[in-house]
């Protein structure tokens, strides 16, 4: 192999010991001398693997409760030594070359994620010797292999088996990149953690004692796929994902069939899935260009799909469909026999439904798994030269949060539709207006520059599909600055309104609702979406 290097001596020191016994046994069987530290050394010895403790190798004991183990010239000289250049000085100082370093780091992320984690706990889980060895081996990848991921053990062993115990330069270089990615992520986590423990700073900072937003944001995403193009065909694109995401998402979903997801597919599927997660009853959300164009809940997902689809069949063409229950055969048949769809995503897919969808080979079918509570990730938006960072909009309202501000009280049925409509409005681009009747959208007005025009668009959409607006409720993601939005809603037949309130002209808006005999409730919470 080109620029291959034989592996004769390896240093193994891992916190995550998954797979290390089998890996070490194979190295030993291939005649590789193994050095190790602390718990790793003990584990290998207990499994009858020939191993030398690092302190015996260096002649210098572990000290300071294990804080100093591998920080020794015999270790770092062996890792950093340049083959063909440093042999004389190595011989003079009794330093032997180390050809393979296998290290993963103290579990800092897991430690600080514990509710009872103290600052002292966090500090003691900051690895020093590990990253030092990792960086040293990665720097000297010309001569040394560095393994930080247990998933690479089989790959390394296979190459050694096929190439007389040697690793090619290409492999060592690739492993070095992974090593630097690993240490960058590790140091970033530490910086983020400590950054939340000091006063905020920067323009307009109020100097809080602690801030959930760190001084710097260090994030790492790994490329999941390259794409044919981005939002438009002249834009290149790729999809990157975070490590260890626990929440069901488009990033973690399994694609069961269909063409590769496009940039727009992923963006729209994310919007559909996050919306359908809001509902506990069987629900269907149909999305086009990241806006819900039809949403419904029902006793089963087939009826929910029927309700969502009839809101706007025209926009549903080529859309994304999300469910919060397993996709069954009847629902799958209803979809594929009726409309062209880009993506269907559900927690799971029945075998019968999968067979039906398979008749449309290009249709992308995703299973995202069940979900529980949403995680508290940041919502991040890129602007030229910076990032806008905020909490995710997980604001919820219940019946107890609603303030009736009109003379007429909403009926029980209206209240149920109001809360449903409010959930949908959170996922519609501002200015957002949503008409709802009987747990299904009737009209959606999205993205207009004036709120009254969003209300008019919702009415036009409903009329185009011959849907009866009379008796529907209306939600608005932000307050009405003028009464014209209420007048437009009344003209369309809206009976009840839910909105945040808070306008300087609230009294005029309330008076307009009273004039039209409408009920109206304030939530005290806004749901702008840009």
Swiss-Prot record:
Keywords: Hydrolase, Multifunctional enzyme, Purine biosynthesis, Transferase. Residues 1-148 form the MGS-like domain. The keyword Hydrolase applies. InterPro entries: AICAR_Tfase_dup_dom_sf, Cytidine_deaminase-like, MGS-like_dom, MGS-like_dom_sf, PurH-like. Pfam families: AICARFT_IMPCHas, MGS. One of its GO terms (biological process) is 'de novo' IMP biosynthetic process. Its EC number is 2.1.2.3, 3.5.4.10. Belongs to the PurH family. This is Bifunctional purine biosynthesis protein PurH. It comes from Psychromonas ingrahamii (strain DSM 17664 / CCUG 51855 / 37).
């Amino acid at each position: 192999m080109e620029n291959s290097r034989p592996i004769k001596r390896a240093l193994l020191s891992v916190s995550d010991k998954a797979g290390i016994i089998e890996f070490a046994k194979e190295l030993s069987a291939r005649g590789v001398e193994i050095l190790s530290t602390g718990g790793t050394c003990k584990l290998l010895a207990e499994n009858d693997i020939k191993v030398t403790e690092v302190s015996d190798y260096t002649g210098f004991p572990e000290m300071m409760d294990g804080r100093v183990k591998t920080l020794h010239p015999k270790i770092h000289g062996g890792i950093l030594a340049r083959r063909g250049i440093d042999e004389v000085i190595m011989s003079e100082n009794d330093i032997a070359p180390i050809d393979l370093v296998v290290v993963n780091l103290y579990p800092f992320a897991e430690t600080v994620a514990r509710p009872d984690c103290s600052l002292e706990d966090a500090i003691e889980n900051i690895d020093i010797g590990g990253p030092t060895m990792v960086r040293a081996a990665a720097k000297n990848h010309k001569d040394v292999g560095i393994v930080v991921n247990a998933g690479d053990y089989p790959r390394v062993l296979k190459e050694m088996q096929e190439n007389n115990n040697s690793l090619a330069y290409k492999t060592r270089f690739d492993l070095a990149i992974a090593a630097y990615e690993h240490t960058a992520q590790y140091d970033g986590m530490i910086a983020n953690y400590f950054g939340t423990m000091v006063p905020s700073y920067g323009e307009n900072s109020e100097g809080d004692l602690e801030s959930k937003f760190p001084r710097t944001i260090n994030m790492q995403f790994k490329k999941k796929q390259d794409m044919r193009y981005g939002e438009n065909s002249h834009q290149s694109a790729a999809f990157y994902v975070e490590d260890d995401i626990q929440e069901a998402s488009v990033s973690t979903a399994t694609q069961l069939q269909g063409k590769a997801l496009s940039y727009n597919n992923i963006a729209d599927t994310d919007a559909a899935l996050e919306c359908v997660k809001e509902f506990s009853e069987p629900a269907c959300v149909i999305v086009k260009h990241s806006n819900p164009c039809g949403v419904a809940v029902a006793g089963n997902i087939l009826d929910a799909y029927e309700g969502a689809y009839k809101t706007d069949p025209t926009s549903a063409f080529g859309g994304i469909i999300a469910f919060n229950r397993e996709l069954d055969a009847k629902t799958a048949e209803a979809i594929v026999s009726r409309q062209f769809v880009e993506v269907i995503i559900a927690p799971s897919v029945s075998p019968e439904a999968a067979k039906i969808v398979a008749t449309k080979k290009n249709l992308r079918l995703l299973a995202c798994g069940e979900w529980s509570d949403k995680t508290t990730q940041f919502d991040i938006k890129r602007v030229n030269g910076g990032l806008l960072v905020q909490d995710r909009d997980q604001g919820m309202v219940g019946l107890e949060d609603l303030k009736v501000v009109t003379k007429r009280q909403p009926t029980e049925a209206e209240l149920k539709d109001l809360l449903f409509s409010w959930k949908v409005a959170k996922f519609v681009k501002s200015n957002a207006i949503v008409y709802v009747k009987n747990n299904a959208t009737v009209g959606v007005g999205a993205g207009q520059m004036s709120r009254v025009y969003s209300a008019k668009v919702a009415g036009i959409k409903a009329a185009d599909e011959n849907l009866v607006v009379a008796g529907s409720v209306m939600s608005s993601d932000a307050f009405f600055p003028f009464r014209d939005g209420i007048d437009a809603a009344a003209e369309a037949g809206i009976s009840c309104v839910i909105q945040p309130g808070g306008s300087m002209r609230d009294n005029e808006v309330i008076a307009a609702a009273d004039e039209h005999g409408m009920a109206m409730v304030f939530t005290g919470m806004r749901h702008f979406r840009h």
